Amino acid sequence: GVVDILKGAAKDLAGHLATKVMNKL
């Protein structure tokens, strides 16, 4: 459903941001 799609997008975004932060450290 829509909620599942939003949850998946949020996880992808969080993972992407975490990767960016780790690369800067």
Curated annotation (Swiss-Prot):
- What tissue specificity does the UniProt entry give? Expressed by the skin glands.
- Could you tell me which residues carry Leucine amide? L25
Task: Name the GO terms of the biological process aspect.
Answer: defense response to bacterium; innate immune response; symbiont-mediated hemolysis of host erythrocyte
Compartments reported by the entry? Secreted
Kindly give the InterPro entries that the UniProt entry links to this protein.
Antimicrobial15
| Gene Ontology CC entries for this record | extracellular region
Pfam family of the protein (one):
Antimicrobial15
Q: Which UniProt keywords apply?
A: Amidation, Amphibian defense peptide, Antibiotic, Antimicrobial, Immunity, Innate immunity, Secreted
Domain of life, per UniProt, equals Eukaryota
* Family to which this protein belongs: Belongs to the frog skin active peptide (FSAP) family. Ocellatin subfamily.
Briefly state the protein's biological role: Antimicrobial peptide with activity against Gram-negative bacteria but without activity against Gram-positive bacteria. Shows a low activity in stimulating insulin release from rat BRIN-BD11 beta cells, and acts without loss of integrity of the plasma membrane. Has very low hemolytic activity. Shows weak amphipathicity in its alpha-helical conformation.
Protein name, please? Ocellatin-L1
Where does this protein come from, organism-wise?
Answer: Leptodactylus laticeps
